[in-house]
From Swiss-Prot:
Localization terms from the record: Nucleus
Keyword Cell wall biogenesis/degradation: no
Cited InterPro entries: CenT-Element_Derived, DDE_SF_endonuclease_dom, Homeodomain-like_sf, HTH_CenpB_DNA-bd_dom, HTH_Psq, RNaseH_sf
Segments of the chain annotated as binding DNA: 33-53, 103-142
Superkingdom of this protein's organism: Eukaryota
Region Disordered, residue ranges: 550-591
GO terms for MF: DNA binding
All copies of domain HTH psq-type, residue ranges: 6-57
Name of the protein this chain belongs to: Tigger transposable element-derived protein 1
A cellular-component GO term for this protein: nucleus
Main localization category: nucleus
Source organism: Homo sapiens
Length: 591
């Protein structure tokens, strides 16, 4: 019996390097530790230990050579480092739906190798690399890039296919009986969430200082809506950190975005499938129910590698249609102005918040020092709030107008959105003047376009270095734990009183009764949920206190003696009322 128990214990705790590698791979694809544990039949603690020490285990893999493995040659470290950067470039290209070919990848590999060799100087002087066909085939196998063509050149946007596709799509819509409310499109976009126009002093200072560059900190957003424009999907945000410091006190499921992560901050097939089954399906089903329309959906997506074809077979009610290759830049609705409009709103909202922060800063510092203080404290949480506000700001006319090329028969009233971006850019320039920043309209255009530009070699090297830095930060002990802020009853009472005092203050200083009264009601209604929590907690406290313990705290009247009984029974000639009993206020123990 003992031997059986020990063997079971061993099977639970003894892991092979292949198992550890599988855990790390699934984690980097965005799967949670609990999900990994369920899939592999392991405890979450075990998964956490491996994932948090991934660098250590990866070194083990490099040094481990199975007995039945024949060592052909030791791989060049410079080539291995180059390939890591090359993978980032390939993923960046495919995420932008830019077709690739063998020759393009070979040329890029050679360029990256020569740049890295020159940077390393004498220590890499003897290193050699030929981007041969044999190397390409081995690299493709190692990196699991099975969809890259081994021959031929990459194709440009297919104008002919784009011209004929709307007719084919119209037939699908007609046969399925889909309305504008039932047709959806989603698309990913790379997003630099903490980036200033290049000519501002903040951008110049960051460029001159070595080390981490906040302006190069990139995330991926998935944005989508229906053709009617009356239903925006909750943005999905993919970051490279599972638990950023700014989010430590927040339950991620309550954020205004669907927060996901992997080490490269990119969409994967696993993440997209999870989004499709866990969020999109139940959300659009609820929407159809509320609108009293049949639950049948047409979802249009591009041919990105992160969009698996298996989605077409999951739900009968959701018809997943892949647009023709190399047509998304011409046809895909989200790419026709929704994403660019959203990004312009994000920039304007960022500048608005900077101005508000400077106005509320009562320190004696200059305008530039106040702006630097604001920008230094601008976190991923602030970015998430900005994403929420900017996505809410995208108008119905923009959401519907971008479908004009794809389904012209369903989109009748079309209002342009380009003027909207131009107006927002003009607003940014005006706010920049108040912030003492050098910003011209072309600077705003350059920044908005930079999100979609292909990464330069310098940016690729920098992103690889920052990725390693974040991996080291994530692997430190204790990062897996998240501390949730406690909302105490005492704090609730304090802040509720502050709001009530503010409402009373406006009424006191404003001679316009209607205005102050309206504001007072709005303030009171806005915190109704917190009042409810507060009163419920007070009620619970009262119920916990027993009736007998309550009365024991009240002053006890003296027991009458026999001598005083007769006297007390005589009517009093005094009109003085007896002193009231002291009331004891119940207080919460430790909150």
């Amino acid at each position: 019996m003992a031997s059986k128990c020990s063997s079971e214990r061993k099977s639970r705790t003894s892991l092979t390097l292949n198992q550890k590698l599988e855990m790390i791979k699934l984690s980097e694809e965005g799967m949670s530790k609990a999900e990994i544990g369920r899939r592999l039949g392991l405890l979450r603690q075990t998964v956490s230990q491996v994932v948090n020490a991934k660098e250590k285990f990866l070194k083990e893999v490099k040094s481990a050579t199975p007995m039945n493995t024949r060592m052909i040659r030791k791989r060049n470290s410079l080539i291995a480092d180059m390939e890591k950067v090359l993978v980032v470039w390939i993923e960046d290209q495919t995420s932008r739906n830019i077709p690739l070919s063998q020759s393009l990848i070979q040329n890029k590999a050679l360029t990256l190798f020569n740049s890295m060799k020159a940077e390393r100087g004498v220590e890499a002087a003897e290193e050699k690399f030929e981007a041969s066909r044999g190397w390409f085939m081995r690299f493709k196998e190692r990196s699991h890039f099975h969809n890259i063509k081994a021959q031929g050149e990459a194709a440009s946007a297919d104008v002919e296919a784009a011209a004929s596709y709307p007719e084919a799509l119209a037939k699908i819509i007609d046969e399925g009986g889909y309305t504008k409310q039932q047709i959806f499109n989603v698309d990913e976009t790379a997003f630099y969430w903490k980036k200033m126009p290049s000519r501002t002093f903040i951008a110049r200072e960051e460029k001159s200082v070595p080390g981490f560059k906040a302006s190069k900190d990139r995330l991926t957003l998935l944005l989508g809506a229906n053709a009617a424009g009356d239903f925006k999907l909750k943005p999905m945000l993919i970051y490279h950190s599972e638990n950023p410091r700014a989010l430590k006190n927040y339950t991620k499921s309550t954020l205004p975005v669907l927060y996901k992560w992997n080490s490269k901050a990119r969409m994967t097939a696993h993440l997209f499938t999870a989004w499709f089954t866990e969020y999109f399906k139940p959300t659009v089903e609820t929407y159809c129910s509320e609108k009293k329309i049949p639950f049948k959906i047409l979802l249009l997506i591009d041919n990105a590698p992160s969009h698996p074809r298996a989605l077409m077979e999951i739900y009968e009610e959701i018809n997943v249609i892949f647009m023709p290759a190399n047509t998304t830049s011409i046809l895909q609705p989200m790419d026709q102005g929704v994403i660019s409009t959203f990004k312009s709103y994000y920039l304007r909202n960022t500048f608005h918040k900077a101005l508000a922060a400077m106005d509320s800063d009562v320190s004696d510092g200059s305008g530039q020092s106040k702006l630097k203080t604001f920008w230094k404290g601008f976190t991923i949480l602030d970015a998430i709030k900005n994403i929420r506000d900017s996505w809410e700001e995208v108008k119905l006319s923009t959401l519907t107008g971008v479908w004009k090329k794809l389904i012209p028969t369903l989109i009748d009233d079309y209002e342009g959105f380009k003027t909207s971006v131009e107006e927002v850019s003009a607003d940014v320039v005006e706010i920049a003047k108040e912030l003492e920043l050098e910003v011209e309209p072309e600077d705003v255009t350059e920044l908005l376009q930079s999100h979609d530009k292909t990464l330069t070699d310098e940016e690729l090297f920098l992103m690889d270095a920052q990725r390693k830095w974040f991996l080291e930060m994530e692997s430190t002990p204790g990062e897996d734990a998240v501390n949730i802020v406690e909302m105490t009853t005492k704090d609730l009472e304090y802040y509720i009183n502050l709001v009530d005092k503010a409402a009373a203050g406006f009424e006191r200083i404003d001679s316009n009764f209607e205005r102050s009264s309206t504001v007072g009601k709005m303030l009171s209604n806005s915190i109704a949920c917190y009042r409810e929590i507060f009163h419920e907690r007070k009620s619970q406290l009262m119920r916990k206190a027993s009736p007998m313990s309550y009365f024991r705290k009240l002053p006890q009247p003296p027991q009458p003696s026999a001598a005083t009984t007769l006297t007390s029974q005589q009517p009093s000639t005094s009109r003085q009322d007896p002193p009231p009993a002291k009331r004891v206020r119940l207080t919460e123990g430790s909150d």
